[in-house]
Amino acid sequence: MSIVSLLGIKVLNNPAKFTDPYEFEITFECLESLKHDLEWKLTYVGSSRSLDHDQELDSILVGPVPVGVNKFVFSADPPSAELIPASELVSVTVILLSCSYDGREFVRVGYYVNNEYDEEELRENPPAKVQVDHIVRNILAEKPRVTRFNIVWDNENEGDLYPPEQPGVDDEEEEDDEEEDDDEDDEDDEDDDQEDGEGEAEEAAEEEEEEEEKTEDNETNLEEEEEDIENSDGDEEEGEEEVGSVDKNEDGNDKKRRKIEGGSTDIESTPKDAARSTN
């Protein structure tokens, strides 16, 4: 947790000439009393191709810092045009406003800066030699890029970040981990057994359903066979009535026999018909 929090930055003179100083109104909050001062620094990026052209415009120490919300104005001199490549004097660059505590940077704010000529004729026809007096800067104050870093403050040290080792604690933790692993394995085995039991129960239920279906099919077939037998018996009784109704002559048995033998060839004789024909 950061003891100092940046609440806001206001650019006071913007736009301005290239040769005018930079001015920022900075507001920050301090949560605890600090042993050291805060160092604020402004850096001008002279070239996008090399760090050699970066210029530290100014740096100040702010302190002692009281607890609560604080505000101050930070002023810095403009960059030296002689240290900037001529091809990058009239272009877009970056300025960096940073704050450090006890040599450790914990916040950095970057702004884009557009440098251009103040006259339309110079913008359309740039002179061979850069005229610094006619360059104006415009800081894009509405779009800062803020970067924060975690550092060690007065109430913190390396020992606080990493608790001391306690003999025997690691062994106990390992044993607890092993017991937890064993418990998890047992639970997994129980779950597997339960799943196997459920699977076997489902299979048994399916087999019972299949057997019940087979039994129902057999019963249905038996009922159909019984109906067929009853129907065949009814047909035989009708046949006997027809045979008995034939007028008898002197040889009644012969007349009955002729009627049966003269029937359709598609009718299959039953054992009863065969027995009747022999009588």
UniProtKB/Swiss-Prot annotation:
Instruction: Kindly give the Pfam families that the UniProt entry links to this protein.
Output: ASF1_hist_chap (PF04729)
Q: Reported effect of changing residue 48 to R?
A: Abrogates interaction with histone H3 and histone H4 and enhances transcriptional silencing. Reduces acetylation of histone H3 on 'K-9' and 'K-56'
Effect the entry attributes to changing residue 37 to R: Reduces transcriptional silencing
Where the protein is mainly located, per its record?
A: nucleus
Q: Which InterPro entries match?
A: ASF1-like (IPR006818), ASF1-like_sf (IPR036747), Hist_deposition_Asf1 (IPR017282)
Q: How does it assemble?
A: Interacts with histone H3/H4 heterodimers via both histone H3 and histone H4. Binds with higher affinity to H3/H4 heterodimers where histone H3 has been pre-acetylated on 'Lys-14'. Interacts with RAD53 and this may impair interaction with histones and chromatin assembly; the interaction is reduced upon activation of DNA damage or replication checkpoints which in turn promotes histone binding and chromatin assembly. Interacts with the CAC2 subunit of chromatin assembly factor 1 (CAF-1). Interacts with the HIR1, HIR2, HIR3 and HPC2 subunits of the HIR complex.
By sequence similarity, the record places it as follows: Belongs to the ASF1 family.
Spell out the protein name for this chain: Histone chaperone ASF1
Species the sequence originates in: Saccharomyces cerevisiae (strain ATCC 204508 / S288c) (Baker's yeast)
By which gene is this protein encoded? ASF1
